[in-house]
Amino acid sequence: MSIISRVCIPCAVLLFAQLHAKELVHVSQLKEQEARISWQEVPGAVSYRVLIRNAHGRIVTNAVATTRSYSFSRLRPGSYQYQIIAYDVLHRASASAWTSLSIEKVHKPKTGGITPSTIEHVVGGEAYTVVXDRXWTYEKGWTIALFPDDKADEAGAYVKPLSVSKNKEGNWMVAIPNAALKTGSYTLRAITPRNIYAEVRGILHVVLWRRPIFFYYDLSVGYAPVYRPQDHAATINGVSDFFKICSPIGFVGTFEMCFFKRNSSTISAGFNAQMHSDSKQVDVKLDGNFAYLYELYPRIEVGGMLGLGYSLPFGQRKEDDSMYSYVTGTMKYFFTNSIYLRVQQQHMLTVKPSFTGVSLQQTPSLSFGYRFHN
């Protein structure tokens, strides 16, 4: 027995599942007064008839659909009712109840109704501000939503702005939570109190980037064992003393000025000051000789996590007045926006006065740090 039948089920009415209001009607600004209704699949149905009548009961749309949705146009704003009739292969029909349908009055926005097309991600800021022109559609009581273009037809896929207001020039100002957006394109829509979309077809292209110049201060403490090649002629009890292991506890402060930051990649230059006690003996006996290091360096960070830089240190090293430079590889893991764990590998080339000797020092280190933002 067919599921859809006028013979076995006289006056049968299909039990259409309740449609989400957001899926019910879309009013598009691209084609004025165009809307779309959709419904769930009816088992056994091969085609559907869509009837729409106005407030006076006159049929204004009588169309056949082979899919579970139907788009229509040229309807004036107002109240309507629609009915879906399902047909099986024997052309037996069963109809849904008449359902209310409202077409909202909307106004066409100007071309490029949203400016700017690229917005800035401000560190620590609460929201982005999007400016729509004066012709942008918004009426009191509506909800404003920003839809990712790849999820434009998914109910609940939108970002709800914090507020909507007008500036003194008469433009609409829409504040959007800065944590909710990712790089991509979005469509701004107004949703009426009856949950009907009044779509504003201005596309907002979002490229998240931080302020081009900003300052921060890194303060970190950690542990750094030092592996230092010595002169080949030096021996202890006839055994070559090629490596000595030193264990200073380092205090490191870093001040950096970021020249460019986009998509979490950084090119920066800064000033670094270090003070650590330098153990020279194999038995890790401190000799009380402190080394002070000051340096000016360029560095690049990729993704805010991996860093590689070449340092240009200057100052005095008390033990032998050596000159040196080194390359440092750094990986940082930020637990929060400020607290991080840093793993660092440093390769230092030391040149003694008058070039009387050259040595290479490797220093892995592990430290915790805190970043102070401006």
Swiss-Prot record:
The keyword Repeat does not apply. The keyword Signal applies. Residues 22-102 form the Fibronectin type-III domain. Residues 1-21 form the signal peptide. Keywords: Signal. This is Uncharacterized protein TP_0483. It comes from Treponema pallidum (strain Nichols). The lineage of its organism: Bacteria, Pseudomonadati, Spirochaetota, Spirochaetia, Spirochaetales.
